C-alpha cells in the first residue's frame, strides 16, 4: 500500500488551493515554490484534476488554479481516484503471496486494510485536512521549510 508521487504531490497542491480557496486563483509557481514540486509536473497534475472538474484554471497575469468546489465538498478520495485512475493503484503493493499461491489469511487482512484506507480517504475532505494540519501545528512547520547549502 502506498501513494504514488502523483497522489502525494496532487494532495499537497490541493491542500494549498484549499487554504486559499476564497481568495481566488493561485499561481502554479507559488505552489511549486512552497511545496518544492517542479512546475511542469505540477501543471500535469493540475490539468488532470481540471479535466475531472476538481480545479478550475484562470489565464492571465493574475491567473492560476482554484478549487472548482468548496474544500468541504472535495474528499481526499476524489483526488486520489483522479490521479491514480481509481483506487486500485493505492492497493497495488500487496504482499508476496508465496510459492503456493495467495494466502487466504493475508488476502483477508489486506482486503480489510484496503477498505479502511478507502473509508478514511472518502471521509476526509480538504477542509478536514486543513483543519487537522492547523490543529496539530503542522502549518507552522510547513511554513518554515529551510534549504541549507554547504
Question: Which stretches of residues belong to each language-model region?
Answer:
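Basic amphipathic alpha-helical segments that dock to polyanions
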Residues: 45-50
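C-terminal regulatory/oligomerization modules of transcriptional regulators
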Residues: 97-150
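Beta-hairpin "wing" of winged helix-turn-helix
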Residues: 54-62, 66-67
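Residue cluster at the C-terminal edge of the helix-turn-helix DNA-binding motif
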Residues: 51-54, 82
